[in-house]
């Protein structure tokens, strides 16, 4: 057994001298592997008398367990040191300044639409939406727009075929609402509309908000009061407002609404072309023909409608002189509206 003790001592010394896990693995194979030195000692038990085998076998197993225990402890120490070194190398200094993130914001047109919707929902209107690809009937015919009207011309409207087109206003949403809903009706219809037009104040795609109110005993004074209060709240100013007689096929009487120029306070400037007034929207009492075609009796119900371009209002509110800036995706421009 002296040889066994010497063998164990050699193994333990080798473990202590090991410099890494690979060296430990070589020691394990040398002493505990299938052909290891302690394994070979175990194989000599067959040469001993039967009465000595249990005692010697227990000593050999104890020796193997001692070596295994020291090996595992040394291996765990190496693994812990390796993990600590890796964590130290990969650690993040949380005191370092961050890279910084650019804060986004709502697009000025989105802000304008939300501002319009907020006012009208506050006074009891609902929000209605409809398809942007519309049929000729709902876009023109049901709105009392005859076949010879200039708006039906190819140079003003995007047609897919003789019957389908990109809507030129959100009025079809009003028609569809009147067809499916009995009065009283109070809605605003925000959405994208399309027209063959592109210059400093026009875009082939723009955003429009139209409003509709249908009920008994509605008159022009109701329309006038609604529009004046909306403009006061939207621009946050006490602006002079005037209603000019105009013509729209779907309203009678019709009017254009002007406000005192927000740039010069009515004194006259380049924006208002020295007139002191700016046109902001169109409106009128819903034409009896439109009510009839939507299944509403004009003898019992009356209503008013109005429509405004969100881009036009945004230009006036924010002092933007070129509508195309809203759609150029220039972050330098858009960042001003955060």
From Swiss-Prot:
Keyword vocabulary terms for this entry: Aminoacyl-tRNA synthetase, ATP-binding, Cytoplasm, Ligase, Magnesium, Metal-binding, Nucleotide-binding, Protein biosynthesis
Nucleotide-binding listed as a keyword: yes
Cofactor: Mg(2+)
Residues reported in the UniProt entry to bind Mg(2+): 252
GO MF annotation list: ATP binding; magnesium ion binding; phenylalanine-tRNA ligase activity; tRNA binding
Cofactor comment text: Binds 2 magnesium ions per tetramer.
EC numbers, comma separated: 6.1.1.20
SUPFAM superfamilies for this protein: Class II aaRS and biotin synthetases, tRNA-binding arm
Pfam families in the cross-refs: Phe_tRNA-synt_N, tRNA-synt_2d
Location in or out of the cell: Cytoplasm
Quaternary structure (record): Tetramer of two alpha and two beta subunits.
Sequence similarity: Belongs to the class-II aminoacyl-tRNA synthetase family. Phe-tRNA synthetase alpha subunit type 1 subfamily.
Protein name, as recorded: Phenylalanine--tRNA ligase alpha subunit
Organism encoding this protein: Pseudomonas putida (strain W619)
């Amino acid at each position: 057994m002296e040889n066994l003790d010497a063998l164990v001592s050699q193994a333990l010394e080798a473990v202590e001298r090991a410099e890494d896990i690979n060296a430990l693995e070589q020691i394990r194979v040398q002493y505990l592997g299938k052909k290891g030195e302690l394994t070979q000692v175990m194989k000599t038990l067959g040469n001993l008398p039967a009465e000595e085998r249990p005692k010697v076998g227990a000593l050999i197993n104890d020796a193997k367990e001692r070596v295994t225990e020291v090996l595992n402890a040394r291996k765990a120490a190496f693994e812990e040191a390796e993990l600590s070194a890796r964590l130290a190398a990969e650690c993040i200094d949380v005191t370092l300044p961050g890279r910084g993130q650019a804060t986004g914001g709502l697009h000025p047109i989105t802000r304008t639409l939300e501002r319009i919707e907020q006012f009208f929902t506050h006074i009891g209107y609902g929000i209605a939406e409809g398809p942007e690809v519309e049929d000729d009937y709902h876009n023109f015919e049901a709105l009392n727009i005859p076949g010879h009207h200039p708006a039906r011309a190819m140079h003003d409207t995007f047609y897919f075929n003789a019957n389908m087109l990109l809507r030129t206003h959100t009025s079809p949403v009003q028609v569809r609402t009147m067809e499916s809903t009995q009065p009283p009706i109070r809605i605003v219809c925000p959405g994208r509309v399309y027209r063959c037009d592109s210059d400093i104040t026009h875009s082939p795609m723009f955003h429009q908000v139209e409003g509709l109110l249908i009920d008994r005993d509605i008159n022009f004074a109701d329309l006038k009061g609604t529009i004046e209060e909306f403009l006061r709240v939207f621009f946050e100013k006490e602006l002079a407002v005037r209603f000019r007689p105009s013509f729209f096929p779907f309203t009678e009487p019709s009017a254009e609404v002007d406000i005192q120029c927000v740039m010069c306070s009515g004194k006259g400037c380049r924006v208002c072309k020295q007139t002191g007034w700016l046109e902001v929207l169109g409106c009128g009492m819903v034409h009896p023909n439109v009510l009839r075609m939507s299944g509403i009796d004009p003898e019992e119900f009356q209503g008013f409608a109005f429509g405004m371009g969100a881009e036009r209002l945004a230009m006036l509110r924010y002092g933007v002189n070129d509508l195309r800036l809203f759609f150029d995706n220039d972050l330098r421009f858009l960042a001003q509206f955060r």
